[in-house]
Amino acid sequence: MVRRLTSPRLEFEAAAIYEYPEHLHSFLNDLPTRPGVYLFHGESDTMPLYIGKSVNIRSRVLSHLRTPDEAAMLRQSRRISWICTAGEIGALLLEARLIKEQQPLFNKRLRRNRQLCALQLNEKRVDVVYAKEVDFSRAPNLFGLFANRRAALQALQSIADEQKLCYGLLGLEPLSRGRACFRSALKRCAGACCGKESHEEHALRLRQSLERLRVVCWPWQGAVALKEQHPEMTQYHIIQNWLWLGAVNSLEEATTLIRTPAGFDHDGYKILCKPLLSGNYEITELDPANDQRAS
């Protein structure tokens, strides 16, 4: 049997000769070079084929049109629409919301994860806690965000292996009182289970190892507005407990969006944590009595 290998050069040439679908040409000239979200629509008026985001909508859409692997989606597309935002943060937030709401055929599905959990470090043990039972935006000593209990315990086990922590003391396996664990005999546990290491030293190493996974508590009392600017547009992103409530054009409109979020939004946390805490954006605390304080 003769195997035919496709070289990178041939793949490049295939991409180079790929032509834009004729039926989409009329949409290309109007594509903006601004940040935002774009949608490829098929026959359905309610469910788009694909939703994407970029800091330059035109450039990103044209890169889709040059990719042979996306030919199937492009053949099904009947039109392209877009929504401009003031920057990358707005594009990321809007994309995540629209994908969840509209479930496009060619996007990776983003659904509300009802098994979302974290490791919570208590005085004597580590527990797996769930977002449906604990307010992850306010609860202290949470580490990691995991799709399910199994993933959380696997992460804890990996930390134990790296740091030679005791499975028994972490609750990962049974531990007979007064006896060393099996891993201690193999030099894979530093011996907190049998007195070779103090429980305090063990707990300190555990906390230090978990620190990189810490879930940051919401640092404000209520909602805030993050200001994002573009030469042609200014948006205020209204956020509470790491949940994006929406965007408005002025602070005067902010109170129309303020509400108590239901549950913890994993995607919102991932997108918003760094910019909100970076000090690079103007953040305004939103008071129900309309007393806004910029920081």
UniProtKB/Swiss-Prot annotation:
SMART domains: GIYc (SM00465). One of its GO terms (biological process) is SOS response. It is an enzyme of class 3 (hydrolase). The keyword DNA repair applies. InterPro entries: GIY-YIG_endonuc, GIY-YIG_endonuc_sf, GIY-YIG_UvrC_Cho, UvrABC_protein_C. GO terms for molecular function: nuclease activity. Residues 33-108 form the GIY-YIG domain. GO terms for cellular component: excinuclease repair complex. CDD domains: GIY-YIG_UvrC_Cho (cd10434). Keywords: DNA damage, DNA excision, DNA repair, Excision nuclease, Hydrolase, SOS response. Its EC number is 3.1.25.-. PANTHER family: EXCINUCLEASE CHO, UVRC/OXIDOREDUCTASE. Incises the DNA at the 3' side of a lesion during nucleotide excision repair. Incises the DNA farther away from the lesion than UvrC. Not able to incise the 5' site of a lesion. When a lesion remains because UvrC is not able to induce the 3' incision, Cho incises the DNA. Then UvrC makes the 5' incision. The combined action of Cho and UvrC broadens the substrate range of nucleotide excision repair. This is Excinuclease cho. It comes from Shigella flexneri. The gene is cho.
